[in-house]
């Protein structure tokens, strides 16, 4: 996997990232006191930034052999489904407990402001399929770590975990240290 997007030179890539970062709304003390919530709805409202994010993901993976994109509930669906469509591959949702209608495999985890369980359909991934997991944001790494465990339980081969935003100070990478990680943006010290 390339360190940056193959068809975007470094200065253009940085300009795009700076423009996208400028559209992220930061909401202090939400959903609980002490948390700065990075609101991506502003990225979705602006057609240029939404397209740029989707294009960056597509450019990164367009030359790779990928079988399925796994998107994490709920904002990972927004980018993961577009990526799957553009790549011509299947999309597998990872949902909060009780939201999938068929037989599931579940994984509990701790996140930045609580506890949660996520699930995936037990027939969503076949042994050896090449998978990219997509979510909007990586903070403490609890959600992505649980999603990685679910994909591995089903026999998927994770090529990379991809995020629009990463909060490196919360050390989420440590929970998935054995995975390749791609983040379009980082918000440090916040």
Enumerate the predicted regions with their spans:
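Active-site-facing substrate-recognition patch
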Residues: 2-66
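PRPP-dependent phosphoribosyltransferase catalytic core
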Residues: 2-16, 145-190
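Short glycine-rich phosphate-binding loop at a beta-alpha junction
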Residues: 66-73
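Residue-level signature of catalytic and energy-coupling elements of molecular machines
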Residues: 34, 69, 91, 161
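Conserved G/P- and acidic residue-centered "switch" motifs that form tight phosphate/ATP-binding loops
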Residues: 136, 141
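Short, glycine/charge-rich flexible loops or terminal/linker lids adjacent to PRPP-binding catalytic cores
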Residues: 89-131
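Conserved acidic residues
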Residues: 67, 129, 159
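Short Gly/Thr/Asp-enriched flexible loops that form oxyanion-binding sites at enzyme active sites
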Residues: 78-87, 148
């Amino acid at each position: 996997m390339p360190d940056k997007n193959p068809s975007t030179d470094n200065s253009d890539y940085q300009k795009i990232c700076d423009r996208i970062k400028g559209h992220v709304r930061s909401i202090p003390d939400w959903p609980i006191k002490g948390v700065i919530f990075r609101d991506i709805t502003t990225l979705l409202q602006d057609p240029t930034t939404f397209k740029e994010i989707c294009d960056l993901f597509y450019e990164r993976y367009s030359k790779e052999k990928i079988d399925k994109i796994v998107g994490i509930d709920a904002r990972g669906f927004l980018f993961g489904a577009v990526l799957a469509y553009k790549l011509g591959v299947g999309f597998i949702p990872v949902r909060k407990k009780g939201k999938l209608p068929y037989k599931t495999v579940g994984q509990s985890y701790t996140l930045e402001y609580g506890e949660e369980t996520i699930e995936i359909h037990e027939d969503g991934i076949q042994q050896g399929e090449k998978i990219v997991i997509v979510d909007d944001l990586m903070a403490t790494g609890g959600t992505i770590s649980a999603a990685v465990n679910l994909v591995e339980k089903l026999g998927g081969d994770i090529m990379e975990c991809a995020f629009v935003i990463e909060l490196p100070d919360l050390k989420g990478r440590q929970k998935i240290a054995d995975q390749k990680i791609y983040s379009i943006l980082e918000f440090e010290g916040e």
